[in-house]
UniProtKB/Swiss-Prot annotation:
HAMAP family: Asp_carb_tr. The gene is pyrB. Belongs to the aspartate/ornithine carbamoyltransferase superfamily. ATCase family. The lineage of its organism: Bacteria, Pseudomonadati, Pseudomonadota, Gammaproteobacteria, Enterobacterales. This is Aspartate carbamoyltransferase catalytic subunit. Keywords: Pyrimidine biosynthesis, Transferase. One of its GO terms (molecular function) is amino acid binding. Its EC number is 2.1.3.2. GO terms for biological process: 'de novo' pyrimidine nucleobase biosynthetic process; 'de novo' UMP biosynthetic process; amino acid metabolic process. InterPro entries: Asp/Orn_carbamoyltranf_P-bd, Asp/Orn_carbamoylTrfase, Asp/Orn_carbamoylTrfase_sf, Asp_carbamoyltransf, Asp_carbamoyltransf_Asp/Orn-bd.
Length: 311
């Protein structure tokens, strides 16, 4: 049947309705269970990373290859005409779009991915991260992992820990989970890195329950998902960072009293906010979460590049 995501730009998680999200996640589950190595056999996809990336770039490019697509692109703009000759982003995208069927793009500037859609013609642009703004495919793999481990995306208790002010992953994930009913949010962060007011206002408008907390221990017994993030040293003065760093570290001993099926997630890279002894517990799920990026990104590529998709 025809799908609503065909040739659609995916720049923000808000570009996807609840039905769209369910379609992507259902497609991801099918591709995980039944690989389709020739689904995009005659497609060419540009992987345009204007800033360095490890997991996102490798995950996207692996997804492309495993669906049979041809991949062109670059992992650093320094050696492109844009980096060396001063070509504009508009011209770069205008040219690349004449070569390929889709563009996957990461850029350090907020709004760059949305700008690219103005110059890509009918070629869909998939945002792989634009500054501290949006990272929709990270949110898709987060949702896929939550649904896979909890069996649902509604009536969940979700704690988010660390840098909630600048962390684009927690902004997008909160916006996505707010599309599903009955979810409750616990925000655990220092005052200087608290969740932005616009996110809290959005939750209030939707009638979603949320509360701020000063420690992980306060909520451990109540949550289904503990979503950890890295507190960035450069965001705080040295004395405050030392306090915060110690306060927002998860250790295996902190998991005593957690719900049996509670999962710890993290967008990675992890520095020292999750100690390695957590890795050995059944709650640790961040490496499986990263692996699910393959299937979430495969699903999105398959949907934007096929007017009809039957798996």
């Amino acid at each position: 049947m025809a799908n609503p995501l065909y040739q659609k730009h995916i720049i923000s998680i808000n570009d996807l309705s609840r039905d769209d999200l369910n379609l992507v996640l259902a497609t991801a589950a099918k591709l995980k269970a039944n690989p389709q190595p020739e689904l995009l056999k005659h497609k060419v996809i540009a992987s345009c990373f204007f800033e360095a990336s490890t997991r996102t770039r490798l995950s996207f490019e692996t997804s492309m290859h495993r669906l049979g697509a041809s991949v062109v692109g670059f992992s650093d703009s320094a050696n492109t005409s844009l980096g060396k000759k001063g070509e504009t982003l508009a011209d770069t995208i205008s040219v690349i779009s004449t070569y390929v069927d889709a563009i996957v793009m990461r850029h350090p500037q907020e709004g760059a991915a949305r700008l690219a859609t103005e110059f890509s013609g009918q070629v869909p642009v998939l945002n792989a991260g634009d500054g501290s703004n949006q990272h929709p495919t990270q949110t898709l793999l987060d949702l896929f992992t939550i649904q896979e481990t909890q069996g649902r995306l509604d009536n969940l208790h979700i704690a988010m820990v660390g840098d909630l002010k600048y962390g684009r992953t927690v902004h997008s994930l909160t916006q996505a989970l707010a599309k599903f009913s009955g979810n409750r949010f616990y925000f655990i962060a220092p005052d200087a890195l608290a969740m932005p007011q616009y996110i809290l206002d959005m939750l209030d408008e939707k009638g979603m329950a949320w509360s701020p907390h000063g420690s992980i221990e306060e909520v451990m017994a109540d949550v289904d998902i503990l979503y950890m993030t890295r507190v960035q040293k450069e965001r705080l003065d040295p004395s405050e960072y030392a306090n915060v760093k110690a306060q927002f570290v998860l250790r295996a001993s902190d998991l005593n009293g957690a719900r049996e099926n509670m999962k710890v997630l993290h967008p990675l890279p992890r520095i020292d906010e999750i100690t390695t002894d957590v890795d050995k517990t059944p709650h640790a799920w961040y490496f499986q979460q990263a692996g699910n990026g393959i299937f979430a990104r495969q699903a999105l590529l398959a949907l934007v590049l096929n007017s009809e998709l039957s798996l």
